[in-house]
């Protein structure tokens, strides 16, 4: 039984990393195609799961068709999370002064985000639905394209994922526009290590 659990944990973690890499690609495609441009300056903005997956129009004039992310990301729980393969996923976009705003269950509105910062910044976390049973590591990525990981048993279950700034350097506490804590301690007190 321990070997089966270890195999399942490994498979779930591998799937979470692959999903984050898929989100990176989807965000790049969405932003470069200027699917959302709330300030009408001709520069595209990054999106939330509802927008990327075609689950709703969000900040766009119409629902994205075809979507750039799997339809499995159309339904968010009350905490703004999507559950996939033993992991919860959450997107944060920048609000005023670069503060991370988690995606609401119904998706983002223009009033929630900073229309200039969202042209250059987003981040996403993945953490176990049940630490030790569905996964051990928590993962992070953003527009830079790196995936980093840490192990923290507190990141387990719905509404108990990392704060928006958890994987950023302490000097950038409170914001998602700063430097990622790659190989060093982040705002959450954990060391975040790059995943290959």
PLM regions and their residue ranges:
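Amphipathic alpha-helical segments typified by the pilin-like N-terminal helix
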Residues: 1-33
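Extracellular/periplasmic head regions of type IV pilus-like filament subunits
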Residues: 22-144, 151-153, 166, 171-189, ...
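Active-site-surrounding "flap" and adjacent substrate/cofactor-binding loops of secreted or lumenal enzymes
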Residues: 155-159
């Amino acid at each position: 039984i321990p070997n089966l659990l270890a195999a399942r944990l490994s498979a779930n973690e591998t799937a979470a990393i692959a999903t984050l890499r898929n989100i990176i690609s989807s965000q790049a495609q969405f932003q470069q195609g200027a699917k959302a441009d709330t300030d009408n300056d001709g520069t595209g903005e990054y999106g939330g799961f509802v927008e990327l997956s075609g689950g709703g129009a969000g900040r766009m004039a119409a629902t994205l068709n075809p979507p750039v992310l799997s339809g499995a990301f159309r339904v968010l729980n009350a905490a703004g999370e999507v559950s996939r393969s033993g992991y919860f996923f959450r997107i944060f976009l920048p609000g005023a002064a670069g503060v991370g705003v988690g995606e609401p269950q119904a998706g983002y509105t223009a009033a929630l985000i900073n229309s200039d910062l969202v042209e250059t910044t987003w981040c996403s976390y993945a953490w176990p639905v049940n630490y030790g049973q569905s996964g051990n590591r928590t993962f992070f990525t953003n527009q830079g394209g790196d995936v980093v990981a840490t192990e923290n048993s507190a990141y387990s279950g719905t509404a108990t994922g990392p704060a928006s700034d958890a994987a950023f350097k302490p000097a950038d506490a409170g914001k998602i526009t700063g430097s990622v804590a790659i190989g060093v301690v982040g705002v959450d007190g954990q060391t975040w290590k790059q995943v290959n």
